[in-house]
A protein has these predicted regions:
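Conserved SAM-binding loop
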Residues: 23
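Conserved SAM/SAH-binding beta-strand->alpha-helix loop
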Residues: 16
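Conserved beta-strand signature within the Rossmann-like core of class I S-adenosyl-L-methionine
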Residues: 93-99
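S-adenosyl-L-methionine
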Residues: 27-53
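Conserved small/polar residues in nucleotide/adenosyl-binding loops
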Residues: 141-148
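Conserved Class I S-adenosyl-L-methionine
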Residues: 83-84, 107-126
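A short glycine-rich, Lys/Arg-flanked "PGG" loop and its adjoining helix->strand segment in the class I
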Residues: 78-92
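Short beta-strand element of Class I
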Residues: 9-10
Length: 153
């Protein structure tokens, strides 16, 4: 996405070192190089310490860990406590773009967004038949192409 929109800054945040390393390697290998990508090794629990109130336009949550066990629901990136943090850093009119291939996580997330009073402007349960305009497929999608993905804005 960064190469298609050089006027937009993209900041990736990940708690696992291996994932950040892989993202940094892939970013460094981009041809032509991109100057609008930064990566943060950190926990989203502390996102309000990194971004100012109203600083972020869009948050992309792509294929995050579904934490399938009910007792781990509070770890899901769409859990209501995280949604409060996102709301704090998002600009007025900002949005979250959430993509997953896990239906249970999608349904949980949809309920959390609704519970927290978020306006949902687009939902699809089939990314392969209803691609999102301006959206870029990620390699994880190709690896799991046999599964149906879901998207929420």
């Amino acid at each position: 996405m960064a190469s298609f929109h050089p006027d937009i800054n993209y900041i990736g945040m990940e708690v696992q070192e291996g994932v950040i390393y892989y993202a940094a390697k892939k970013t460094a290998e981009m041809d032509p190089p991109v100057a609008n990508v930064r990566l943060i090794l950190g926990d989203v629990k502390h996102i309000q310490d990194i971004f100012a109130r109203g600083e972020v336009s869009v948050i992309y949550l792509n294929f995050s860990d579904p934490w399938p066990k009910a007792r781990h629901a509070k770890r899901r990136l769409t859990y209501r406590e995280f949604l409060k943090k996102y709301e704090w850093i998002l600009k007025e009119g900002g949005e979250i773009r959430f993509k997953t291939d896990n239906k249970d996580l999608f349904d949980f997330s949809l309920a959390e967004f609704k519970e927290m009073g978020w306006k949902i402007s687009f939902i699809t349960y089939d990314l392969h038949r209803e691609p999102v305009k301006g959206d870029v497929a990620v390699s994880y999608t190709h690896l799991r192409a046999h599964e149906t993905g879901a998207y929420l804005v």
